[in-house]
Design a protein with these regions (language model features):
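N-terminal pro-sequences and low-complexity stem/linker regions of secreted or lumenal proteins
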Residues: 24-525
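C-terminal motif of bacterial Sec signal peptides marking the signal peptidase cleavage site
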Residues: 18-21
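Bacterial N-terminal signal peptides that target proteins for export
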Residues: 1-9
Length: 525
């Protein structure tokens, strides 16, 4: 019998399991170059405590004290109760019906939305939406005290709601138990989806040059001299118990012309139609919310330069491109809860000039994820994913309050993961599942202080891979840019300026730079 053949199988096993091979020599852990495929799945609008506050071993609701959870009013005095959930807790047409009146006199503390003895609103029900905007998020965080979420919300006490979940209720919870859950992961920027998608791909904040002389002039925010606090309107209710706040102007732009709340892509598919008689591939540039094409360096540029293959798979992208050309309704920002509800501002690369319609760059890298992720799943099953893939589920599968529920998106992402686990590429794959931002929901952990853009509130993140530590809760400090850091590390890319600036700001404020996710993996440093 051939001794080389006898020895081959144990060596192969040892390489995979870090055990001993023939001759007793120890096989070391693989290094980061063993990872050939990186997949990022980007869901929507949930704080860590909202979904994973009960997760065993995590820094969750069991660590919340009355002092750390108590909400104060706009003037800093303790609220006697939480405000009512303005306009009701559940979305119109949703069962159960939880009206505004039914939410009166909620205790000033976190509460379970799905409590059978309370509102009994399960994860299959769509709640109303909540403010999740740049300045409001900072005002709610209140310097790290997290005590003004109710004060500066448009949704009243709903900000303090969470779900009492477990592996039987939430498919991703079960997956988190099998792999790694990061419980110290913060959204990259303050506020909402638009800005956090930009930070996912470029660690940068978009600009609108000469905005004061543009159609967007009316969207320049009115901000106090601290650069953080919106100017409150004279007719704003003095107390959060009397109604939502009103501002002089909570706009989409900063006074120095950065775009920080939802602006529309300059290219179709966009929330703004083409100009009458204009190029159907473009959004109307005269619309106040059309952002000029951006030219900052993004992760796609760095990957291209390094000859690393990559793609952004937008759920329902193909349907949205077609709808923009034909005028088909109920695809882009769908009008009902069953529509695909494609969200143009969730497609960050569609804002960049080097990915304009008609370019080879766009054709190669901005791909249709298909309805229900069908095209993305085809690429998974065939083993043809590029080295770096981003997947954005369509609107009704992304877990965003106001237009979808938790359960639909969570099950969809779990289904996608099951395909990834069976993919020919799985053995050398790392999957990161996270959320763009907190959706306005409270979380008890203070974000580390850094730069003017973030990081914002804590959000869930799962690291799923054959290399991931199993049954592990990772307490390393991360934010959305940690995904870029990981990609940068793995493919030896230059560091984006926003990442370097974020690290410098963290250090200058007495914190550590953000981790790059490798602490969640069984690989050599």
């Amino acid at each position: 019998m051939n001794k080389k053949l006898i020895c081959a199988t144990p060596i192969a096993i040892a390489a995979a399991l870090s055990l001993y091979a023939c001759g007793g020599s120890e096989v070391t852990q693989p290094d980061i170059t063993s990872i050939k495929t990186v997949v990022v799945i980007y869901a929507e609008n949930r704080s860590f405590d909202n979904l994973y506050g009960n997760f065993p071993g995590a820094n969750g609701l069991q660590n919340v004290t009355a002092a750390s959870a108590t909400q104060v009013d706009r003037n800093g005095t303790t609220l006697a109760t939480l405000p009512q959930v303005w306009n009701g807790l559940t979305q119109t047409g949703v069962t159960p019906v939880v009206t505004q009146a039914m939410t009166a006199n909620l205790p000033n503390s976190p509460f379970a939305i799905d409590d059978p003895n309370g509102f009994n609103t399960p994860i299959t029900a769509t709640t109303r939406d909540l403010y999740h905007r740049f300045y409001e998020n900072q005002m709610q965080i209140d310097g790290g005290k997290n005590d003004k979420f109710a004060a500066w919300a448009d949704s009243g006490g709903l900000v303090m709601g969470h779900y009492s979940l477990n592996a039987d209720k939430l498919p991703l919870w079960k997956i988190a138990q099998q792999y790694t859950l990061a419980d110290n992961f913060f959204m990259g920027a303050f506020g909402g989806s638009f800005l956090n998608h930009q930070w996912l791909v470029c660690a940068c904040t978009p600009t609108y040059p000469n905005a004061d002389k543009s159609p967007a002039a009316g969207s320049i925010s009115s901000v106090e001299s601290d650069g953080v606090t919106l100017k409150v309107a004279a007719n704003s209710p003095a107390s959060a118990l009397s109604g939502p706040p009103k501002y002089v102007n909570s706009g989409n732009l900063t006074p120095d012309f950065y775009a920080i709340n939802t602006m529309q892509p300059p290219y179709q598919p966009s929330g703004n139609k083409a100009a009458s008689g204009g190029d159907k591939n473009l959004a109307d540039p005269s619309a106040a919310t059309t952002l000029p094409a951006q030219t900052q360096q993004h992760i796609g540029d760095l990957l291209n330069n390094a000859k690393v293959s990559w793609a952004w798979y937008g759920g329902a992208w193909g349907a949205a491109v077609s709808a923009a050309q034909t005028g088909t309704s109920n695809v882009i920002y769908g009008a009902n809860l069953s529509a695909p509800n494609f969200q143009p501002h969730h497609q960050p690369f569609n804002y960049f000039a080097d990915l304009a319609p008609g370019s080879a760059n766009r054709a190669q890298h901005l791909l249709d994820g298909g309805l229900g992720g069908s095209e993305f799943i085809k690429a998974i099953d065939s083993g043809t994913l590029p080295q770096v893939s981003f997947y954005k589920p369509q609107g009704n599968l992304n877990e965003h309050p106001g237009y979808t529920d938790v359960a639909s998106g969570d099950q969809h992402i779990a289904d996608v993961i099951s395909h990834l686990q069976k993919s020919p590429q799985w053995n050398n794959m790392v999957v990161v599942v996270t959320y763009d931002e907190n959706g306005g929901f409270w979380d008890h952990v203070a974000p580390p202080k850094a730069d003017r853009w973030g990081p914002g509130t804590r959000i869930p993140a799962l690291i799923i891979s054959p290399y991931a530590k199993k049954g592990y809760v990772d307490h390393t400090q991360y934010d959305t840019t940690s995904i870029l850091r990981f990609i940068t590390h793995r493919f030896s890319l230059p560091t984006l300026p926003g990442i370097a600036a974020r690290d410098a700001a963290l250090v200058s404020n007495g914190s550590k730079p953000m981790g790059d996710l490798t602490a969640a993996l069984n690989i050599r440093p």
